Amino acid sequence: MTSYRQPDAAGHFGPYGGSFVSETLTLAIAQLRTAYARYQNDPEFLAEFGDELKHFVGRPAPIYHAARSSREIGGAQIYLKREDLNHTGAHKINNVIGQAMLARRMGKPRVIAETGAGQHGVAAATICARYGLECVVYMGAHDVRRQSPNVYRMKLLGATVVPVESGSRTLKDALNEAMRDWVTHVDDTFYIIGSVAGPHPYPMMVRDFQSIIGKECIEQMPAMLARNMAAGQQPDAVIACVGGGSNAMGIFHPYIPFAGTRLIGVEAAGLGLESGQHSASLQKGSPGVLHGSRTFVLQDANGQITETHSISAGLDYPGVGPEHAWLQQIGRAEYVGITDQEALDAFHFLCRTEGIIPALESSHAVAHALKLAKTMRPDQSILVNLSGRGDKDIGTVADLSGADFYCRPSCHGQSVKGASQ
């Protein structure tokens, strides 16, 4: 698919995308488009961005051959793109640096952000501390409770964290409140959106900043495969979890021209795709407008957004980036669901076979890779985008496992077993 050129000048990916915003934000969006058009290919901007990725984030992120997991599962060889090793512990920092650089060039001293799992909020707080910008992070009250370590990290970094009590008190509601803030502080505020969602140019801009993931993989994989005597120069499949979809788009986009590589996005199937308790917008949603763009949305017959569920705060969102909707429509990417329990099992499996604690978001991608590998040959390969580390999720996993996270006196001297045992 060498002719892939998306979006168009108006930000459309086929019938998806575009910009559906209030009149108050029209000028701010226009200014952002102009600024990004000016700097996206500017040598000085790109050099600074690359320098920050190398010296502040620690890129390039390595690719790791999960050899023990591959042997235990059987079938294809599994490789992990280690975004969890980035500074702040996830892929989110890649995009935040690019947008913060734009904010400085546009003269915006105040930054706002939404966050679900807290990783985008931590990344925003981190770069604002580095650049001397005011930072306000909106986070659903439910997510504040289940991701409390990241809340404290944001506060340590100087950010103001605003719990959102409206709606389902999750990522959707945090994004709503951030949009309201932007409307009332449009002159001095830059909104750093964390995913490939929102009005144009955000889906394109976030994708471009995150594409460093896939670009590195294309350079790294030939040597990895040759070292393990695997077939081909690139993986047979690339797998990433999809909520809004920024980590997935970051690894997918550079691979779009590689026809021999399947692109597989993994949505949160929650308690099951037929349960009504999930966040699988592409599999169970329908076209609609959410947060400024047309995409696939979980909505009822009257167009009202329905409640979502996922064990993973970062995937608990009723929409998806418009480019994912387009890639599904044209058949270049496929999207599947993984349940809460399957993600938990994969979380424990990776901990015990590789010594890596993955984020619950990333665990969804790992779970599908483990399933898929069994159907493939040993000389074939799967590349998983391990989008973040799981430190933030240990409390959630401990609660679900019946473990005593704080190891109170009653648990001293006792072994604590995980849910998968």
UniProtKB/Swiss-Prot annotation:
Transmembrane segments: none annotated. One of its GO terms (cellular component) is cytoplasm. It comes from the Bacteria. The keyword Lyase applies. InterPro entries: Trp_synth_b_CS (IPR006653), Trp_synth_beta (IPR006654), Trp_synth_beta/beta-like (IPR023026), TrpB-like_PALP (IPR001926), TrpB-like_PALP_sf (IPR036052). Pathway: Amino-acid biosynthesis; L-tryptophan biosynthesis; L-tryptophan from chorismate: step 5/5. Its cofactor is pyridoxal 5'-phosphate. It is an enzyme of class 4 (lyase). The beta subunit is responsible for the synthesis of L-tryptophan from indole and L-serine. NCBIfam families: trpB (TIGR00263). Pfam families: PALP. It comes from Verminephrobacter eiseniae (strain EF01-2). One of its GO terms (molecular function) is tryptophan synthase activity. The modification N6-(pyridoxal phosphate)lysine is found at K92. Belongs to the TrpB family. This is Tryptophan synthase beta chain. Keywords: Amino-acid biosynthesis, Aromatic amino acid biosynthesis, Lyase, Pyridoxal phosphate, Tryptophan biosynthesis. Tetramer of two alpha and two beta chains. Signal peptide: none annotated. Its EC number is 4.2.1.20. It catalyses: (1S,2R)-1-C-(indol-3-yl)glycerol 3-phosphate + L-serine = D-glyceraldehyde 3-phosphate + L-tryptophan + H2O.
